[in-house]
Amino acid sequence: MSEPTPVNDDEEAFAESTLTQAIENQIESNNPPAAQATLNKLTLVGYERGDILNLMAHVLATEIDAMLAENRAFDTQWYETALRALPELPPEKP
């Protein structure tokens, strides 16, 4: 088994930026509706927008990692449930 390739800072910044933009697009298009609902909920309880986007991006990254590892389609139901559970982060998938 090969060792994972280390991620450099530029790649990490690009991934973070891309995930954040994906979340912004979901909020703007209200698709899935859980994206806007999560933003509203966390804003009401005092979270800053940047922190909310980071939490939501973490959930998106978790699902994308699982999707790629398991060679399956994106699980929209899991994703929406995990968004609605924020600020509690989902458990890391094996």
Label each PLM-derived region with a short phrase.
Residues 1-94:
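Structure-specific DNA junction-binding interface
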